[in-house]
A protein has these predicted regions:
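Charged docking surfaces used in two-component/phosphorelay signaling
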Residues: 67, 157-330
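N-terminal Rossmann-like NAD(P) cofactor-binding subdomain of oxidoreductases
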Residues: 1-190, 226, 290-291, 295-301, ...
Length: 330
């Protein structure tokens, strides 16, 4: 099997390399692609040194079986035909094709069969916040249909890229030294602050990030589920957290939900609050599962249930989910 990584030098591209190294996939050849800025860089994979090739409109993708792409929406749109024209399946991490009717949007724990319905040979990876939420929601959906979801996200700096992480670190150092903090990657200082603003605002006063959670959840789950989200950037380096409230068609006991989460693929139950056992980014960073805890009956709605989930948005929220999509196609 011949695999390409497009955007190999970025945070997700580097995670692709690590995950392919870890998992027992039959990779006969791995080809790395990048922009002019990253072309020529060298990385090790399974004992071999690989050089990043410049992504161009040519026949470099001839013979490629799968292309894992994380280079931004504009690059994905521009190069989709180049990547797929010789038969490669493009698994795209950007927002470029997610809501296209003829492009499946896949989370393997939820809708793996959709991956085989890709007439354009493009499969979209959902947004990171959507991925971890639907992995958890699917466990509840198996018990009773979910009518509504309210979710507030606590999204780490790394969701905005490596430069955003560096800025958060720099802000802490600058403030500690009594200096004015550098503010470039976020609308405001993130250190010692939270910012209820991720992506641009839309006409309905929700941000694009929040509307992604609405539209993507419905497409992935093939459901009329209604999702109202508030997405917040918090001064955490890595791993996103979500406070989730669901209304189901029938009342669910917390014990039922715990059992469902414990049995759900991709979920690790951490729900012993009396013993201070609950998910946190501190423990989830660098890990694969979606961690779920703080499961409780809602006090304001008979059919309501609340829980808290945490996951590494670079692994399960991006690179791992894409590799799992590839694995479902083998």
């Amino acid at each position: 099997m011949k695999i390409a990584i497009v955007g190999a030098s970025g945070a997700v591209g580097q995670e692709f390399l690590r995950i392919l190294e870890e998992r027992p996939l039959p990779v006969d050849e791995l080809v790395l692609f990048g922009s002019e800025r990253s072309a020529g860089r060298k990385y090790m994979f399974r004992g071999k040194e690989l050089t990043v090739k410049l992504l161009q409109h040519n026949d470099d993708f001839r013979g490629i079986d799968f292309a894992l792409v994380s280079a931004g929406a504009s690059t994905s749109r521009e190069f989709a035909d180049t990547i797929t024209k010789h038969g490669a399946v493009m698994i795209d991490n950007s927002s470029a094709f997610r809501m296209d009717a003829d492009v499946p949007l896949v989370v393997p724990e939820v809708n793996p069969g959709d991956a085989r319905q890709a007439p354009r040979r493009i499969i979209a990876n959902p947004n990171c916040t959507t991925i971890q939420m639907v992995v958890a929601l699917q466990a509840i959906e198996r018990l009773s249909h979910i009518r509504r979801v309210h979710v507030s996200t606590y999204q780490s700096a790394s969701g905005a890229g490596a430069a955003a992480m560096a800025e958060l670190e720099a802000q802490h150092a600058e403030l500690g030294a009594g200096q004015a903090p550098t503010v470039e990657k976020f609308a405001f200082q993130l250190a010692y602050n939270v910012i209820p603003h991720i992506d641009v605002f839309t006409d309905n006063d929700y941000t694009k990030e929040e509307m992604k959670m609405f539209h993507e959840t419905r497409k992935i789950m093939h459901s009329d589920i209604r999702v109202s989200a508030t997405c917040v950037r918090v001064p955490v380096m890595r791993a996103h957290s979500e406070s989730v409230w669901v209304e189901t068609e029938r009342p669910l006991l917390p014990e039922e939900a715990r059992a469902a989460f414990a049995a759900a693929p991709g979920v690790v139950l951490m729900d012993e609050p009396a013993d201070k056992v609950y998910p946190m980014p501190l423990f989830a960073a660098g890990q694969d599962p979606v961690y779920v805890g703080r499961i409780r009956k809602d006090l304001a709605c008979d059919n309501g249930l609340a829980f808290w989930c945490v996951s590494d948005q670079i692994r399960k929220g991006a690179a791992l989910n894409a590799v799992q999509i590839l694995e479902t196609l083998l």
